[in-house]
């Protein structure tokens, strides 16, 4: 409930050098008076002693106050920066929890209040969640673009064009003889709507790039048994992930590790050797390997140069790099390989990482980071584009029906940013946050 005042640990779990406790809601000023003696100057750090109701000191620290609506949540907000021990936090939380109308925040409740009070839209909220969980440089940059409102500004500008088009058409329908209504607005409106359709279509094509940055570029290691697949996974991961033996068919399941290559999240998969298997367990492993290949962004086709075998039924249309392995066992490799490596000596591994990085980066050539990054963005944009296309192409339909399609297109755009009813999405989105955000 927005009438409650909420509090939570906003920094990392204790013990730590400093912990930040965030408070938001109508009782924030009263809490500061009770705990710190008075309300400090707006947006200024004040060194205070935090005390219990019995005037016993809990800790010394910095107190900051941000009056609403000029705060993160749009409400009165306070931050207490204190020592990050479990005992200090327990004592502080005991005092806060004992105040009527004050309670511990739920997951993402601070951000949800920011959304409810118009401080953030849904895309910005999702960008904030992604920024908190970002592990690579490109994830950070994409999250900053979204949390700063760059993507939302694009969607808002498109929504305004749709609203203007509807207004002009409806004005022409309702007031055909008025001098204030431009005559024959149809040509102007539908020309702009065609441009908008092209803009949205181009934007939608970049959705896969956003998904790759956020969810990872899938690289599958494939090849015949004993081609060195598990050894390569371990070498690139720089740790023992997969069991390596000379026995063919050791790998039965798909193993996966995350790599940071040139700022991109790369999901690397080790798979069972591709061959006709008799063992039921190995057969299932081969099946899973083929499923992984089908979903891959890139396949590393490994060939043992000391005993070259390439699975004959491998889909050659799949984006792939042919890698000759066990370079240390042959004098000169064939020119049939894009790259030759030895996991024993490390020869060629750096070049392979660089090659993967270049291939990933090529997917983003010429793209800005103002791109959709989630499946729900993609779904709403697809529906928006379909409604807009229907409005443009159904030239023989009643003008009011075409205008209704424009309204639907604007509604689908609004669902992305939360400008229209998206109540069913909110619990899912805000549950991704930690308690103190």
UniProtKB/Swiss-Prot annotation:
Gene3D superfamilies cross-referenced by the UniProt entry: P-loop containing nucleotide triphosphate hydrolases (3.40.50.300), Probable tRNA modification gtpase trme, domain 1 (3.30.1360.120), tRNA modification GTPase MnmE domain 2 (1.20.120.430)
Localization: Cytoplasm
Positions that bind (6S)-5-formyl-5,6,7,8-tetrahydrofolate: 22, 79, 119, 437
Annotated Gene Ontology cellular component terms: cytoplasm
Cofactor (UniProt): K(+)
GO molecular function, one term: GTP binding
Major location category of this protein: cytoplasm
Major enzyme class: hydrolase
UniProt keyword list: Cytoplasm, GTP-binding, Hydrolase, Magnesium, Metal-binding, Nucleotide-binding, Potassium, tRNA processing
Domain TrmE-type G: 216-361
Binding locations of GTP: 226-231, 245-251, 270-273
Tagged with keyword Magnesium: yes
Note describing how the cofactor binds: Binds 1 potassium ion per subunit.
Gene Ontology terms: biological process: tRNA methylation; tRNA wobble uridine modification
Pfam families (UniProt xref): MMR_HSR1, MnmE_helical, TrmE_N
NCBIfam families: mnmE_trmE_thdF, PRK05291.1-3, small_GTP
Subunit structure: Homodimer. Heterotetramer of two MnmE and two MnmG subunits.
Similarity comment: family membership: Belongs to the TRAFAC class TrmE-Era-EngA-EngB-Septin-like GTPase superfamily. TrmE GTPase family.
Name the record gives this protein: tRNA modification GTPase MnmE
Species of origin: Rhizobium etli (strain ATCC 51251 / DSM 11541 / JCM 21823 / NBRC 15573 / CFN 42)
Chain's gene name: mnmE
């Amino acid at each position: 409930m927005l009438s409650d005042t909420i509090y939570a640990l906003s920094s990392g779990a204790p013990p730590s050098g400093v912990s930040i406790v965030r408070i938001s809601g109508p009782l924030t000023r009263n809490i500061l008076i009770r705990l710190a003696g008075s309300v400090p100057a707006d947006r200024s750090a004040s060194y205070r002693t935090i005390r219990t109701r019995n005037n016993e000191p809990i800790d010394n620290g910095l107190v900051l106050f941000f009056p609403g609506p000029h705060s993160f949540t749009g409400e009165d907000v306070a931050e207490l920066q204190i020592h990050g021990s479990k005992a200090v936090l327990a004592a502080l939380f005991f005092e806060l929890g004992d105040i009527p109308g004050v309670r511990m925040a739920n997951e993402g409740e601070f951000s949800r209040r920011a959304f409810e009070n118009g401080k953030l839209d849904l895309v910005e909220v999702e960008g904030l969640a992604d920024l908190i969980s970002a592990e690579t440089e490109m994830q950070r940059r994409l999250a900053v673009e979204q949390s700063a409102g760059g993507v939302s500004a694009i969607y808002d500008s498109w929504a305004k064009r749709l609203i203007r088009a509807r207004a002009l058409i409806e004005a022409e329908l309702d007031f055909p003889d008025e001098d204030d209504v431009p005559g024959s607005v149809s040509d102007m409106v539908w020309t702009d709507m065609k441009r908008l359709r092209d803009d949205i279509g181009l934007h939608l094509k970049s959705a896969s790039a956003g998904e790759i940055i956020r969810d990872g570029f899938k690289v599958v290691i494939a090849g015949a048994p004993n081609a060195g697949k598990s050894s390569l996974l371990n070498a690139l991961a720089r740790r023992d992930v997969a069991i390596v033996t000379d026995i063919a068919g050791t790998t039965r399941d798909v193993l996966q590790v995350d790599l940071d290559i040139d700022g991109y999240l790369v999901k690397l998969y080790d798979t069972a050797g591709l061959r006709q298997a008799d063992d039921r367990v190995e057969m299932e492993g081969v099946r899973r390997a083929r499923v992984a290949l089908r979903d891959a962004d890139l396949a590393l086709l490994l060939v043992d140069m000391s005993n070259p075998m390439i699975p004959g039924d491998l889909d050659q249309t799949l984006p792939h790099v042919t890698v000759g392995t066990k370079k240390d066992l042959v004098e000169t490799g064939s020119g049939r390989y894009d790259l030759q490596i030895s996991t024993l000596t490390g020869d060629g591994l750096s070049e392979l990482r660089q090659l993967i990085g270049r291939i990933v980066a090529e997917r983003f050539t010429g793209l800005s980071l103002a791109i959709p990054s989630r499946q729900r963005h993609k779904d709403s944009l697809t529906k928006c584009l379909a409604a807009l296309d229907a409005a443009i192409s159904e030239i023989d339909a009643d003008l009011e029906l075409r205008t209704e399609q424009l309204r639907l297109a604007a509604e689908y755009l609004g669902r992305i940013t939360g400008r229209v009813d998206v109540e069913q999405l909110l619990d899912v989105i805000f549950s991704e946050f930690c308690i103190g955000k």
